[in-house]
Structure formats: C-alpha cells, structure tokens
C-alpha cells in the first residue's frame, strides 16, 4: 500500500480557500445578538412614534403595517410583535430609517433649545424693560414695540401683585410667533 504525499490536498483543482479576495469574516454569536437587540430597540422607537412622525420615515407597507399593529397590541403580544419588527428590520437597509429618526429627534431638541432661549428673553424683557425691547426689535424688526411694552408692563404688575403670570405667558407666545414667522 502506497502512502499519499502530505501535500496531495493542495493540488485539488478549484480549491481557492487561500484566495485573498475570499476573506472570511468571522462574527461572534454575541455580536449578532447585540445587533438584533439594537434593531429591536429601533423597532420599539418606531412603535412609540405618532402617526405624523411615522409618515416622515421611509417605511415599506409590510413594516408600516407591523408597526401600526404593534401600536394597538398590549402586553405579551406587543413583545412578540416587537420581535417580528426586529426580524423585519434585519432583512432591510435600516440606515434611511435611522437617519429619518435622528432628524426627528434633532428637530425636537432644536425646538427645546429655542424655547429655552425665548423663556430667557422673556425674563429679560420683564426685568430690563426697554433695553431688552430694543434687542427684540433688532432680532425681529417687524415686532410691535407698543404691544411688547404693554405686555411687559402688565407682567410687572402681575409679578408685584403675586398674580398668575398671564402676561408673561402672552409675551412668550408672542416671541414664539415672531420666531416661527421668521423661519
């Protein structure tokens, strides 16, 4: 009986295991689970969105129907539906969905920052008076100086009389209208 040479397997035709182009990428089971869990969380975020926000996100009809169903389901059925949504997301390109969701979140954050700035400006208007009114008029030249002064005067009276800050709220609403009409 003859013994085969040790390198006999190297000469098999069509064997290109060591080809540099066919690099095998090994992914751990834990990493696959983490990715699946992340997609499930993305699905849960989509389920928590309202109808108007969902309209702004690029979803196909199957995924949209699954999300709308999950919004109606409670308890254990919801968990299973979230699992299904996660599975559906694994089969799709989720980058456009993530980008649209980030855009929605960013818009909300920008609105919160704007409201804080307007609240600060309102407080300055009440404390500083005409100096702050001049600043508002430089920001928004079409603002009504007389209306602002009247609201500031009423807000100061309410503050001195320990009354509810109705005029302060009106100042904030007026500033918000000015900011919205500008953009």
From Swiss-Prot:
Keyword match Ribonucleoprotein: no
Origin superkingdom: Bacteria
Keyword rRNA-binding belongs to the record: yes
GO cellular component: cytosol
Gene Ontology molecular-function annotations: ribosome binding; rRNA binding
Subcellular location: Cytoplasm
Example of a GO biological process term: assembly of large subunit precursor of preribosome
InterPro entries linked: DarP, DarP_sf
Keyword vocabulary terms for this entry: Cytoplasm, Ribosome biogenesis, RNA-binding, rRNA-binding
Major place of residence: cytoplasm
Database matches in Gene3D superfamilies: PSPTO4464-like domains
NCBIfam families: PRK05255.1-1 (NF003593)
Biological role: Member of a network of 50S ribosomal subunit biogenesis factors which assembles along the 30S-50S interface, preventing incorrect 23S rRNA structures from forming. Promotes peptidyl transferase center (PTC) maturation.
Family membership noted in the UniProt record: Belongs to the DarP family.
Name the record gives this protein: Dual-action ribosomal maturation protein DarP
Source lineage: Bacteria, Pseudomonadati, Pseudomonadota, Gammaproteobacteria, Enterobacterales
């Amino acid at each position: 009986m003859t013994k085969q040479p040790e390198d006999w397997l190297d000469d098999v035709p069509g064997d290109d295991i060591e080809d540099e182009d066919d690099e095998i990428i090994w992914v751990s089971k834990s990493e696959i689970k983490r990715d699946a869990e992340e997609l499930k969380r993305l699905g849960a975020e989509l389920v928590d969105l309202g109808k108007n926000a969902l309209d702004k996100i690029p979803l196909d009809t199957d995924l949209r129907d699954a999300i709308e169903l999950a919004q109606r389901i409670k308890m254990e059925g919801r968990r299973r539906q979230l699992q299904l949504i996660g599975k559906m997301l694994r089969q799709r390109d989720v980058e456009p969905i993530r980008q649209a969701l980030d855009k929605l979140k960013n818009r909300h954050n920008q609105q919160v920052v704007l409201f804080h700035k307007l609240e600060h400006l309102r407080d300055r208007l009440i404390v500083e008076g005409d100096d702050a009114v001049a600043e508002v008029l430089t920001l928004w030249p079409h603002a009504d100086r007389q209306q602002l002064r009247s609201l500031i005067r009423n807000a100061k009276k309410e503050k001195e009389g320990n009354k509810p800050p109705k005029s302060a709220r009106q100042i904030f609403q007026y500033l918000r209208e000015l900011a919205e009409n500008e953009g």
